């Protein structure tokens, strides 16, 4: 071979390798090579490293190697070059037999990283096997009387090669008496027959030698031969013959074993042993047929030996022969074609082709949710199948070409039925009919078609004030009949505002479990009831929601100590109150007035005298009214200056308290001359320029105040005209314009120009959204008092007590001017126990639960005068409301007057010496018939 031949061969190998790689990548994605069987050891199969794209420098580090020892038996892999070569000769027939495809798997392992590559090596068939016959020689005896055209079957040759390398055709050595005829069987294999062309003559030639050659289709072709010796017999020159060379017979499947299929009947005209026949299967009868049928050699009867199944094979072919006993024996051949009849012995089958599972509950009626195929291995009517569905289901079966459809026939509702058990019944048309059941569980998937619903339309929660943030209020619960995300609920506070602030700043709702927590510390004095809207939303698409109301009631705690209004704390060093030494026992000295911002029992106040007083036995204090009276007559040796310390305690648990200190000066005065309100005022010094300036400023401020108050009175009258309050009253509810509230009270004393007390105004700023103003008015012409309720006022931060003229309020536009003592109100009546008595009828013992207030006229006037004097000298203020004369009243949503004595026992009406008694039907502040006195609203109407 020349030097140019090697590069050409190398180039061809490279082209073959590239073609192999392309085919490998396109077909299976794995490395695939082919090699011819019986290749010499060392024959290159392919370069694995090159095909994997590995660099030659990386082969050592990657340690390319075969994955198993079994692979190394036939192949070797070069670590240096990555070439896969044949290790030993491979015999395809021993590995794969007669299979048309022979693939030998090889595993290749690389390291760093560890990879496993599957390589398939196809072993190509090599025509290395020649056709061969079962015996090298065959002796055939043919009578000389054999007719021309007689056919004699010959043995077929066998070739283990496959494809074109197997037996392709036969040839017969030339002979004038015989020729070769080759038939093709159903499996495509050639079948040789020896044909007698002309009659034999034993005398001319007693033996004929024929060579039968079988040639395969390989390149180069291989062949095999057998020697056929034909012996010509002189006698028995008639061979057995059948009525027909092809016999057709039918038998039903599942025929019992032993059933007679056919009785062969061949004839031989010879006599004697030459005419005695033996029957047997021909050489071309398959082993399967021999297992199913049996042939009686003497009678020729064919019986069933095994199970006949139409589905296994509908047709059988039996080759039979009849041989006489002549010398030589003669044979006759026939073919029995057995047709198997179908019996309905196979139940139909239902095959699920497609099923939408689960099915949306919103699926429209008529939607296909499943496809089914049916089949029956039987034939004819035995193979005709119908499919039915169980009744009372919202589904129906619709037949189509080659399949059945499962459709919805009614609307679906998952909340009513979450799944359906569907029974499908397949039946064939055979007799008897066979059936097959198929059970399907069809789930219904949820659609968000149900809104969540709260278990309650209204939830109520209670919480004590001052509880820390995060306190659990209650738990709201909702349910949703949907499932999954459609039933996954999220709770929230619906965006509304409370007192100008978002509701979410007051409470927090756990979005997962609906627990409601306080976001802040609640103050009962600021807020008594909170209305919240809680919403719930599911997680469906689109989401559905629902709302419920939550009322949170804040419960009062005793967190406010009593606030002393009179005497005002810090005024201990102001001008003391004067008390004549001639005052009889039981005389009203002063009155301690206090209020409590709490409610209910926490606001019930009691008064007691502390031992720190100068002379504890000299004075008595009323437990419920705070009135300080003399316990005995004053003596000469009593100290001229008396300090009375009064303890004010509420009824809470634990109770809170405050103290009030009253300074008294004992004076020697004529007991007939009772002090006036003006006597308690300090006389101003002589007028100076400063006084003039003050008068001018007072006039200016008074004018401005008059204009302002006139405007406010007009608005008040407009509100009364709209139906809020009675005709002469100015007491109504008003929302606070500011969210800031104060828990203080500001007393405001208004005096006349002569120094006498005109009226006293106490503005209470409770901690909710309303203000209450209570005014005690004193007529300048009498020692009585007018007690009125003004409408709620929105005032600024309470300041110090105002005695300047600019603090005077005009009542001309809101209340009718009173120029004289008002007559007693006809809607207040005396009870029998309240009729006035003589002086000193008041019992000084305050150990009872509440004072009975049975005062005579003189004692009542003395109390009113003392109250006016206390306010006039600036040493005290009087708390308004129902506790103007000392009773602490709390008007809140949870405070009822049923728990305490009637507050009107401490309210004094001008022109009367008795306490108030409610007349039926007058609690709403309506004008009484025939009366024009001052009117007062019931405590039920005086809510904050």
UniProtKB/Swiss-Prot annotation:
Extracellular side stretches: 30-693
Keywords: Calcium, Cell adhesion, Cell membrane, Glycoprotein, Membrane, Repeat, Signal, Transmembrane, Transmembrane helix
Glycosylated residue positions: 265, 443, 547
Matching Pfam families: Cadherin, Cadherin_2, Cadherin_C_2, Cadherin_tail
InterPro entries: Cadherin-like_dom, Cadherin-like_sf, Cadherin_C, Cadherin_CBD, Cadherin_CS, Cadherin_N, Protocadherin/Cadherin-CA
Signal peptide location: 1-29
Single GO term (MF): calcium ion binding
Chief site of localization: membrane
Region (Disordered): 722-747, 812-853, 914-944
Keyword Transmembrane listed: yes
GO process annotations (BP): homophilic cell adhesion via plasma membrane adhesion molecules; negative regulation of neuron apoptotic process; nervous system development; synapse organization
Membrane topology note: Single-pass type I membrane protein
UniProt feature, compositional bias: Basic residues: 934-944
Listed PANTHER family: CADHERIN-87A, PROTOCADHERIN GAMMA-C5
Functional note: Potential calcium-dependent cell-adhesion protein. May be involved in the establishment and maintenance of specific neuronal connections in the brain.
Protein name according to UniProt: Protocadherin gamma-C5
């Amino acid at each position: 071979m020349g030097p140019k031949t090697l590069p050409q061969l190398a180039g061809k190998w490279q082209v073959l390798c590239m073609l192999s790689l392309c085919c490998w990548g396109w077909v299976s994605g794995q490395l695939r090579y082919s090699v011819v069987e019986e290749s010499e050891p060392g024959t290159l199969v392919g370069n694995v490293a090159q095909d994997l794209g590995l660099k030659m420098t990386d082969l050592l580090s990657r340690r390319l190697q075969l994955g198993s020892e079994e692979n190394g038996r036939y192949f070797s892999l070069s670590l240096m070059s990555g070439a896969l070569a044949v290790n030993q000769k491979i015999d395809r027939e021993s590995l794969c037999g007669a299979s048309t495809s022979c693939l030998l798997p090889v595993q290749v392992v690389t390291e760093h990283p560890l990879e496993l590559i599957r390589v398939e090596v196809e072993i190509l068939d090599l025509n290395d096997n020649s056709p061969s016959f079962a015996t090298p020689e065959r002796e055939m005896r043919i009578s000389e009387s054999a007719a021309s055209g007689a056919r004699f079957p010959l043995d077929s040759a066998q070739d283990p090669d496959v494809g074109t390398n197997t037996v392709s055709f036969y040839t017969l050595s030339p002979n004038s008496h015989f020729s070769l005829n080759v038939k093709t069987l159903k499996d495509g294999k050639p079948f040789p027959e020896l044909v007698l062309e002309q009659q034999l003559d034993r005398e001319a030639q007693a033996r004929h030698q024929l060579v039968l050659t079988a040639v395969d289709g390989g390149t180069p072709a291989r062949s095999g031969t057998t020697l056929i010796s034909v012996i010509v017999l002189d006698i028995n020159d008639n061979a057995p013959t059948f009525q027909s060379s092809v016999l057709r017979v039918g038998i039903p499947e599942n025929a019992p074993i032993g059933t007679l299929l056919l009785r062969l009947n061949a004839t031989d005209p010879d006599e004697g042993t030459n005419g005695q026949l033996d029957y047997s299967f021909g050489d071309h009868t398959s082993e399967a047929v021999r297992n199913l049928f049996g042939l009686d050699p003497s009678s020729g009867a064919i019986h069933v030996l095994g199970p006949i199944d139409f589905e296994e094979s509908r047709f059988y072919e039996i080759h039979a022969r009849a041989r006489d006993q002549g010398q030589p024996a003669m044979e006759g051949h026939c073919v029995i074609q057995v047709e198997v009849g179908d019996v309905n012995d196979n139940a139909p089958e239902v095959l699920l082709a497609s099923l939408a599972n689960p099915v949306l509950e919103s699926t429209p009626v008529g939607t296909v949710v499943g496809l089914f195929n049916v089949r029956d291995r039987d034939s004819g009517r035995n193979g005709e199948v119908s499919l039915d569905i169980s009744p009372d289901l919202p589904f129906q079966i619709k037949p189509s070409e080659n399949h059945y459809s499962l459709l919805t026939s009614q609307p679906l509702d998952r909340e009513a039925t979450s799944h359906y058990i569907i029974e499908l019944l397949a039946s064939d048309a055979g007799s008897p009919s066979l059936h097959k059941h198929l059970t399907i569980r069809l789930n219904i998937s949820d659609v968000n078609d149900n809104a969540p619903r709260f278990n309650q339309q209204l939830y109520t929660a209670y919480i004590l004030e001052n509880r820390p943030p995060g306190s659990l209020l209650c738990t709201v619960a909702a349910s949703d009949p949907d499932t999954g995300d459609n039933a996954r609920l999220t709770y929230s506070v619906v965006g509304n505002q409370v007192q100008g602030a978002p509701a979410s700043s007051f409470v927090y709702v756990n979005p997962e479990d609906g627990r409601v927590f306080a976001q802040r510390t609640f103050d009962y004095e600021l807020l008594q009831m909170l209305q919240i809207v809680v919403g719930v939303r599911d997680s469906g698409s689109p989401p559905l929601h629902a709302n419920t109301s939550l009322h949170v009631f804040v419960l009062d705690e005793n967190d406010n100590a009593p606030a002393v209004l009179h005497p005002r704390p810090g005024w201990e060093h102001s001008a003391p109150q004067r008390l004549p030494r001639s005052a009889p026992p039981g005389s009203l000295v002063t009155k301690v007035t206090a209020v409590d911002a709490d409610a209910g029992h926490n606001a019930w106040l009691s008064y007691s005298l502390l031992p720190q007083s100068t002379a504890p036995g000299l004075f008595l204090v009323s437990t419920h009214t705070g009135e300080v009276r003399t316990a005995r007559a004053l003596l000469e040796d009593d100290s001229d200056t008396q300090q009375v310390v009064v303890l004010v305690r509420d009824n809470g648990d634990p109770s809170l308290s405050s103290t009030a200190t009253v300074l008294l000066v004992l004076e020697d005065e004529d007991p007939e001359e009772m002090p006036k309100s003006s006597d308690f005022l300090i006389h101003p010094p002589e007028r100076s320029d400063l006084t003039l300036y003050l008068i001018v400023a007072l006039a200016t401020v008074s004018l401005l105040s008059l204009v302002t108050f006139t405007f406010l009175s007009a608005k008040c009258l407009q509100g009364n005209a709209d139906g809020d309050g009675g005709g002469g009253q100015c007491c109504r509810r008003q929302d606070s314009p500011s969210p800031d509230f104060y828990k203080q009270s500001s007393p405001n004393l208004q005096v006349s120009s002569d120094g006498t007390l005109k009226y006293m105004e106490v503005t209470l700023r409770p901690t909710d959204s309303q203000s209450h103003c209570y005014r005690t008015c004193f007529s300048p012409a009498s020692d009585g008092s007018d007690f009125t309720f003004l409408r709620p006022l929105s005032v600024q931060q309470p300041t110090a007590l105002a005695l300047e003229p600019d603090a005077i309020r005009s009542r001309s536009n809101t209340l009718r001017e009173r120029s004289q003592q008002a007559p007693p109100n006809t809607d207040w009546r005396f009870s029998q126990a309240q009729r006035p008595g003589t002086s000193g009828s008041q019992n000084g013992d305050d150990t009872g639960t509440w004072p009975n207030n049975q005062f005579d006229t003189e004692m009542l006037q003395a109390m009113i005068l003392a109250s006016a004097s206390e306010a006039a000298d600036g040493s005290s203020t009087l708390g308004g409301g129902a506790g103007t004369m000392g009773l602490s009243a709390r008007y809140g949503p949870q405070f009822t007057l049923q728990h305490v004595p009637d507050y009107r026992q401490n309210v004094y009406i001008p022109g009367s010496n008795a306490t108030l008694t409610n007349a039926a039907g007058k609690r709403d502040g309506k004008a009484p018939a025939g009366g024009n006195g001052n009117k007062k609203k019931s405590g039920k109407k005086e809510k904050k």
